[in-house]
Amino acid sequence: MTNPLGVILAGGLATRMGGGDKGLLQIGGQSLLARVRDRLEPQVAALALNANGDAARFADLGLPVVADSSDGVAGPRAGVLAGLDWAAGQGADAIVTAAADTPFFPTDLVARLVAASKGQTHPLVLATTPRTGEELKSGGRSKVNRHPTFGLWPVALRDDLRAALQDGLRKVVIWTDQHGGREALFDATPFDPFFNVNTPADLTRAEELLQ
C-alpha cells in the first residue's frame, strides 16, 4: 500500500459553544484545525479538509476543501466518503481521517494504523483506547473505546460505503465490522489522546494540556 492521504473531518458545528465552526476555536493562540493539520500533515502523502459551506473561511489553512458528496447523509460518515472520493481522484489506495476538534492525537497515528492493516486485502482499521474502570462498569463487553473519526479507510470500498449510507447506515462501525475492520490500540495515559473539544470546559482543559 502506498502512503495514505489524510482527511480532516470538520463538518461539526460548535453547538454547545454558541455555534460556528468548532475547528476554528483557538487554544494557545492557534486554531484547533491548524493544530490538527500540523500533526497530521507530516504523516501523510497529501492532506485535505472535509467541510461544507463557503471554503474561503478555511483559506488560511492552505488545504484543499472537499465537501460532502453523499446527498441526505451528514456527519463523519459522509466526511469519510467525501475523503475517499477525493483520494480516488488522486490515485490513492487509502486515507487516514482525523477529527478537527481533537488536537492531541498520536504523532504515530498513521504508522500504527497502517501496521495494523498488514495482510488485509482492503486496509480498514480504527483507532482504539482502553476503557477506564468507570466505563467498564457502565456495561458492554468491549474493553476498548473505538474512535471512528480516526481510521484507515480503503478507496476500493468507497462505493460499498456509499451504498450503505444510502441504505440508512447510521453507525459506521457496523460497516467496518462487516468488512473485517481491525483495531489499533493506543495508550490513554496520562490522558486520552483522542480527547475532543465539545464544550467550554473541554476548551479550558485543552488549554491546560498544552502547558
Where are these regions (language model features)?
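Nucleotide and nucleotide-moiety/phosphate-recognizing core
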Residues: 1-172, 177-193, 200-201, 208-211
